Amino acid sequence: MLSLQTIAKMAVATNTYSKCHYPILKVFGLWWKNNTLNGPIKICNHCNNIMVGEYPMCYNHGMSLDIALIRAVKERNISLVQLFTEWGGNIDYGALCANTPSMQRLCKSLGAKPPKGRMYMDALIHLSDTLNDNDLIRGYEIFDDNSVLDCVNLIRLKIMLTLKARIPLMEQLDQIALKQLLQRYWYAMAVQHNLTTAIHYFNNHIPNIKPFGLRCALYFNDPFKIHDACRTVNMDPNEMMNIACQQDLNFQSIYYCYLLGADINQAMLMSLKYGHLSNMWFCIDLGADAFKEAGVLAEKKNRRVLQHILGLNIFKRELIPPCKDPDPYQIQILLKNYILKNVSTVFTYYCQ
């Protein structure tokens, strides 16, 4: 049951006040000051979001109670930790990022179950497995700059996160800091499952994440996100094509890069190198004709049948009508249920 003081503070925080009331709000404990915030604390009647400063009372502003609580714990702001817990924030999330004995004791006194051992990893996995915008954001806030992860096996953690994200998060295991790895992990999970609220949040809170966002869009075959990312990220079309070819059946990503001027012969060879034959056949449909080089590569990979097929002079090229501009709507309509035409040509040849 909420105390009378808690109810009174919540009632005050649901209203907007002029600057002449600010000294009273500070005394009342409804003020948040740190490196980035300095203003009165408000709580939205509709969504329970916490707002700081001169924001209107409406949806999609501020931060959730849990996020506010997590940040207060990281700042070791005892009064705000108590306030946000009383208002309904989950103190168990705060306990996961309490890095000092005093904050750990405070969280425990407020009802948190002290996390131990694998509970940190279990929480990280759980928050990403729910495939929910709010949980991904909570996971990012809890584990960003969280020293409790210093004690885990870093190589094992990096491998696990990469496998779950289904996209290469780094070129080599020792080339990326844990902080950056986790940021990429949360972002990749959001893009992979089209969690738009989380994507927008990460774009605003993770520095220099947009180039990785373009990589995710290419890898997960999303022409709309590719189109949006290309407005702010300058990447060579051939580099984009290399990323697109790393995942099979990425026809829409490959076609987008092709329209930007990427080398379709190199895309054909890269697709074969990665073992993604559907991508290779799609490149041939687009007009790729690097059959001699592909035959040599197929021989090196001990694909004798494919080597023989690539030596046949039966293929038709430029079977897909080109678009003037890389329009994601046209690309999706054109390729959503695309059937590889030169694969059909091969079947027809051998069935005659």
UniProtKB/Swiss-Prot annotation:
InterPro entries membership: ASFV_MGF360
Keyword Nucleotide-binding: no
Induction trigger: Expressed in the early phase of the viral replicative cycle.
Record field: transmembrane: none
GO BP terms in the entry: taxis
Alphabetized UniProt keyword annotations: Early protein
Function, in words: Plays a role in virus cell tropism, and may be required for efficient virus replication in macrophages.
Family to which this protein belongs: Belongs to the asfivirus MGF 360 family.
The protein's name: Protein MGF 360-16R
Phylogenetic lineage: Viruses, Varidnaviria, Bamfordvirae, Nucleocytoviricota, Pokkesviricetes
